[in-house]
Amino acid sequence: MDGGNQSEGSEFLLLGMSESPEQQQILFWMFLSMYLVTVVGNVLIILAINSDSHLHTPMYFFLANLSFTDLFFVTNTIPKMLVNLQSQNKAISYAGCLTQLYFLVSLVALDNLILAVMAYDRYVAICCPLHYTTAMSPKLCILLLSLCWVLSVLYGLIHTILMTRVTFCGSRKIHYIFCEMYVLLRMACSNIQINHTVLIATGCFIFLIPFGFVIISYVLIIRAILRIPSVSKKYKAFSTCASHLGAVSLFYGTLCMVYLKPLHTFSVKDSVATVMYAVVTPMMNPFIYSLRNKDMHGALGRLLDTHFKRLT
């Protein structure tokens, strides 16, 4: 397993966060519980939105797609992690590692872009309510979502293709929970300057520009809310944005904990922060968006009531 270029038959060893059998058992049950909560929560959000005509609006259209992305995101990483925690064989093939990396990178970018589009939706709803129906037409919503998908797919392809040019030497042991770009680049023995340059350039375009757009949108939203004379209307306007603002803060906060640092300082200690954006954020999003949302409460109640009646 030493030296030379990777071939299709070569493997990495995903050792995870701990090599202690006792700790691995604890981690297994913890991640299994979090995975099941994430799957159930996001599936319920998708089903509730699809089954309730009152939720067939741009905001919930994007929320359903965000839930689908989060569902896909955790399914890309956690099942393999659970298998590794219960197995002595912790190997992942080179092709499997790159596949996991591709979906990881693409889906993080997609999550980011959808959150930016949702910020625009909230801006139009609060700042231009009279033009909301025309400004957020079904055609525009589909166009915006399609653009998010195209950009995220291209972003993932660029970095995955560049990773195939990297040579790995020495130990193939990855003290991490999945195949993560920074971890793989730290293991490289070839020149990764082009990877690093492209990572910064594309990262600024895919992450910093949407993040800046989100910040500007919320500055304008808060200004508009403060101008509303009625206290009850202020509260209603803010409550429609609070859940999205919470999701944005959680997503970017955890992402910054991992990636807002030089590549050479990246270490296995960052795996804890990675768990936050890779596992905790997708798990928390359904709770954040439904906690104080009466429309979502009603839709979920009707959905569960219908299914319980069918069972009885």
From Swiss-Prot:
Topological domain spans for side Extracellular: 1-25, 80-100, 159-196, 260-271
Superkingdom per UniProt: Eukaryota
Transmembrane segments: 26-49, 58-79, 101-120, 140-158, 197-219, 237-259, 272-291
The protein's name in its UniProt record: Olfactory receptor 1D2
Bridged cysteine pairs (disulfide): 97-189
Family stated for the protein in its record: Belongs to the G-protein coupled receptor 1 family.
Record-linked CDD domains: 7tmA_OR1_7-like
InterPro entries: GPCR_Rhodpsn, GPCR_Rhodpsn_7TM, Olfact_rcpt
MF annotations from Gene Ontology: G protein-coupled receptor activity; olfactory receptor activity
